[in-house]
Amino acid sequence: MDTKAFKRSLQHSENYNRKGFGHQAEVATQLQSEYQSNLIQEIRDRNYILQRGDVTIRLAQAFGFCWGVERAVAMAYETRQHFPTEHIWITNEIIHNPSVNQRMQEMEVEFIPIEGKNKDFSVVGTGDVVILPAFGASVQEMQILHDKGCKIVDTTCPWVSKVWNTVEKHKKIDYTSIIHGKYKHEETVATSSFAGKYLIVLNLQEAQYVADYIINGGNREEFLTKFAKACSAGFDPDRDLERVGIANQTTMLKDETEQIGKLFERTMLQKYSPIELNQHFQSFNTICDATQERQDAMLELVEHNLNLMVVIGGFNSSNTTQLQQIAFERRIPSYHIDTVERIKSGDSIEHRQLNGQLITTENWLPDGEIVVGITSGASTPDKVVEDVIEKIFAVKATAALV
């Protein structure tokens, strides 16, 4: 499929909208009431530090809702206001935050049901309204909805669209897109659908495996087994790694994406020559500004003398996991939670480890005076961060009375 031509056709359709419906002012008031926080603004005004009792909170200087998330959520609210009685569907979670997605359900925005491993688009009728989330949707899903005559509201983050444009450039010049990301993540599923030949690498270790194969060759069947779910149909590592371009899931660790890009640049230099490099390697900057800002702020925060970190965000949020990774690498006790309810009465907390396991830790708040670092993923409202901070203050104050 000529994905570029399809996008152009879709975007000129009268059933397509990616600019909203003119209800920004009304929606802004509603969003501020539901998601913003006076306490968080107070902490910002106090140089991102707040002390109460034995607890000092240090807040990262960039955290929470990014511009792309705010835009997506606002457009979803506008859509319901503009279509008060219509059936509204959404292809995936609008963002990776449980409280926001719960709010979507309360507004009667329904998820496309899944039958087996596939979405059942048969439930969507002609004239229904369908929201594409901030992560985007695959070109195949867009085509199904377009062919059905649905009203499509596209909230895809512009940074994600930028990555799509990059892999389309790779496809045009017959390069394989090496995508740094998680092959199951909605964003990477969408990005790969716009690519021609592609290979998805999770981390630097997998990238090194691919680089070694480019230089030395290897066991083709082992390679294809390793990346069976992370490559394009018919992928042949002996043929399709001669010319490669780098792209990324926008929420991955910036430093790792840069290292992967440099690794493949060095690999192609070694395999070919400096003169031939531009015929075998392409790299464009597709690192999201908001992701980079939050990671940089986290790197600055962990330089302080912290007793522990609390990282707030959806358990399926990739950018939140990357923030947790930074604390883990600094050996700071760190707790990834998605809602304030994970902090239990007494002194226990239910939290997600980097391996995905959900565990409960007792006595997680040390005795005496403590400094707690706080950050949140790009899909986390300030109101959720406020609730967590207030709960920490309350638990610590109760413990002091015992």
UniProtKB/Swiss-Prot annotation:
Question: Gene for this protein?
Answer: ispH
- Residues binding dimethylallyl diphosphate, per UniProt: H96, H185, S317, S318, N319, S379
Associated pathway? Isoprenoid biosynthesis; dimethylallyl diphosphate biosynthesis; dimethylallyl diphosphate from (2E)-4-hydroxy-3-methylbutenyl diphosphate: step 1/1; Isoprenoid biosynthesis; isopentenyl diphosphate biosynthesis via DXP pathway; isopentenyl diphosphate from 1-deoxy-D-xylulose 5-phosphate: step 6/6
Choose any GO biological process term that the UniProt entry carries and state it: terpenoid biosynthetic process
Alphabetical keyword list: 4Fe-4S, Iron, Iron-sulfur, Isoprene biosynthesis, Metal-binding, Oxidoreductase
- Please indicate if the UniProt record lists Metal-binding as a keyword: yes
Q: Which GO terms describe its molecular function?
A: 4 iron, 4 sulfur cluster binding; 4-hydroxy-3-methylbut-2-enyl diphosphate reductase activity; metal ion binding
State where [4Fe-4S] cluster binds.
Answer: C66, C157, C288
Q: What does this protein do?
A: Catalyzes the conversion of 1-hydroxy-2-methyl-2-(E)-butenyl 4-diphosphate (HMBPP) into a mixture of isopentenyl diphosphate (IPP) and dimethylallyl diphosphate (DMAPP). Acts in the terminal step of the DOXP/MEP pathway for isoprenoid precursor biosynthesis.
Q: Which Pfam families match?
A: LYTB (PF02401)
Per the entry, the cofactor note is: Binds 1 [4Fe-4S] cluster per subunit.
Q: Give me the reactions it catalyses.
A: isopentenyl diphosphate + 2 oxidized [2Fe-2S]-[ferredoxin] + H2O = (2E)-4-hydroxy-3-methylbut-2-enyl diphosphate + 2 reduced [2Fe-2S]-[ferredoxin] + 2 H(+); dimethylallyl diphosphate + 2 oxidized [2Fe-2S]-[ferredoxin] + H2O = (2E)-4-hydroxy-3-methylbut-2-enyl diphosphate + 2 reduced [2Fe-2S]-[ferredoxin] + 2 H(+)
What cofactors does the UniProt entry give for this protein?
Answer: [4Fe-4S] cluster
Q: What is its EC number?
A: 1.17.7.4
List, alphabetically, the Gene3D superfamilies matched.
Answer: 3.40.50.11270, 4-hydroxy-3-methylbut-2-enyl diphosphate reductase, catalytic domain
**Protein name as catalogued:** 4-hydroxy-3-methylbut-2-enyl diphosphate reductase
Q: Which source organism does the UniProt entry give? A: Nostoc punctiforme (strain ATCC 29133 / PCC 73102)
Domain of life where this protein originates: Bacteria
Highest lineage ranks of the organism? Bacteria, Bacillati, Cyanobacteriota, Cyanophyceae, Nostocales
Q: Entry's InterPro entries? A: LytB/IspH (IPR003451)
